[in-house]
């Protein structure tokens, strides 16, 4: 059967989908999560072959796409940075045309948004963005599913992102929230405010949904009546040379218990897309502590382990939401309208 809404489409950025479509995917994710919990098979991709292209390393994205594909009856094949020649020895166009003849769908996690767009343009199969420097759409479905699970709704809630307001997670939270009717506040130093084009895009969606967008470096203004506090690493992959600068700049934007209390909402939840640098129990954490004198970075260990934390639910939801995207765009489902 033909899926007239999603069949054959790529999932490259949230802005390409309507509010109704994103809400449908979140609802489908919840349904597939329930089937998984009840051990009911859902092999909507039986016999399909899925290519997993990774320029950037990953734990959650790789694990989520792999388990989601297997649960759906598909066969995932991992191709790491040393296995693919995108833009190096072979153009992205040529690679896409080859992979599109061998695989039924392609996931890409890397640096360039243009690269994932070229894969979609030339492969002839659905392509799913597992993360680029600009957008992180599969993460957003997991994030907003987690929010919906905790509050029973999305519209009218307030989500506050604390930290680097220019990174892919901040971009995606801002735009996706605006589409879904969620008020999104970016709490960030002016030097790291989101790009003007991203803010304008979000404001356009917010006008349609009734949400509001706030970009501020004032903590009181940012977190007042917050339902969700969200943060991410201070230094994104590829920016390691800016570590000292970011630690100094972002220390006032750390999610700690003082910030939680400032929100004035005992029912708020804390989210983090992980990995989180909340202690010195890793080689990386010890190295940062020795070099920069900080034992906790974007979130304190107290908040990370508190009653407010939902990041491990959020991480699990990566699998369920990725499964929904693959099933809807490639599976034998009939969804004539949303």
From Swiss-Prot:
Source organism superkingdom: Bacteria
Residues at which carbamoyl phosphate binds: 58-61, 85, 109, 136-139, 273-274, 318
Reactions this protein catalyses: carbamoyl phosphate + L-ornithine = L-citrulline + phosphate + H(+)
GO molecular function terms listed in the Swiss-Prot or TrEMBL record: amino acid binding; ornithine carbamoyltransferase activity
Principal place of residence: cytoplasm
PANTHER family membership: ORNITHINE CARBAMOYLTRANSFERASE, CATABOLIC, ORNITHINE CARBAMOYLTRANSFERASE, MITOCHONDRIAL
NCBIfam families linked: orni_carb_tr, PRK00779.1
InterPro entries in UniProt: Asp/Orn_carbamoyltranf_P-bd (IPR006132), Asp/Orn_carbamoylTrfase (IPR006130), Asp/Orn_carbamoylTrfase_sf (IPR036901), Asp_carbamoyltransf_Asp/Orn-bd (IPR006131), Orn/put_carbamltrans (IPR002292), OTCase_ArgI (IPR024904)
Entry keywords, A to Z: Arginine metabolism, Cytoplasm, Transferase
List of residues binding L-ornithine: 168, 232, 236-237
Organism lineage: Bacteria, Bacillati, Bacillota, Bacilli, Lactobacillales
GO CC, any one term: cytoplasm
EC assignment: 2.1.3.3
Stated name of the protein: Ornithine carbamoyltransferase, catabolic
Reported function: Reversibly catalyzes the transfer of the carbamoyl group from carbamoyl phosphate (CP) to the N(epsilon) atom of ornithine (ORN) to produce L-citrulline.
Protein's GO biological process: arginine biosynthetic process via ornithine; arginine catabolic process to ornithine; citrulline biosynthetic process
Family: Belongs to the aspartate/ornithine carbamoyltransferase superfamily. OTCase family.
Entry's localization field: Cytoplasm
Record has Cytoplasm as a keyword: yes
Biological pathway: Amino-acid degradation; L-arginine degradation via ADI pathway; carbamoyl phosphate from L-arginine: step 2/2
